[in-house]
């Protein structure tokens, strides 16, 4: 069994740069409350993942604020960059979480524990707030997957590579839809990939890409949440808990979904 706490889209701001506004204080307080809630979980998650947009402007000062809060977590945290992040500054402040694991250009890396694998997929695009999936990135991802094909694998990335619209108009947050189609084809041919964890759209959304379960979570910054009923009125902090467990006595075969149980829980914290 492995348990993962997912947070995303904290969008922290630096008071020095924008003044002591209510939004600055609120976002800092949101993250502090989230950390307190995760630290009070029993049992504790095995690891915490942050699926991007740690800060609003990507400054060292903003990441320093994030670090002062996130270092209070009882368990380790790992990151994948969002469109608002500055990757060199993210690496500079969160050295232990990133520097030895990431490619110089792309933040694509993996960790293995308890018989499972987690892979960060970098969807950052230098000239757009939308995501980018290039052949170079997919090749690096493929290399990470191929190192341990027998392990059930979850990918965490900022931009969800699927339609996130609740209405008839399709909304896919990528600069090149053809890249997304190629990525889907790639994923569907990898039977050991069991889940994608995403952020970016600031609301809870669940879908599938073939056999793969996909989860997109709300923003920790409640003023940016699409779920205004929750964020504005009740001020609840939301994050996701994911648990994977193997069925005893079974070997991993082609249909990985038959031997891995995926549970998700939306946690509302309203102290």
Label each region the model flagged.
Residues 1-64:
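N-terminal active-site segment of His-dependent metallophosphoesterases
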Residues 2-16, 115-125, 154-156, 212-218, ...:
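Active-site-proximal beta-strand elements of phosphoester/diester hydrolases
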Residues 6-8, 47-53, 77-83, 122, ...:
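Active-site neighborhood of phospho(di)ester-bond hydrolases with catalytic His/Asp-centered motifs
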Residues 10-14, 87, 125-127, 161-163, ...:
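Feature marks short, surface-exposed loop/turn motifs that line or immediately flank catalytic pockets
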Residues 18-25, 168-174, 230:
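Short glycine-enriched, charge-decorated loop/helix-capping segments at active-site entrances
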Residues 33-47, 131-213, 249-250, 269-270:
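His/acidic metal-ligating clusters that form di-metal
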Residues 60-147, 176-192, 210, 215-218, ...:
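Extended active-site neighborhood of metal-dependent phosphoesterases/phosphodiesterases
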Residues 243-271:
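A short C-terminal boundary segment appended to hydrolase-like catalytic domains
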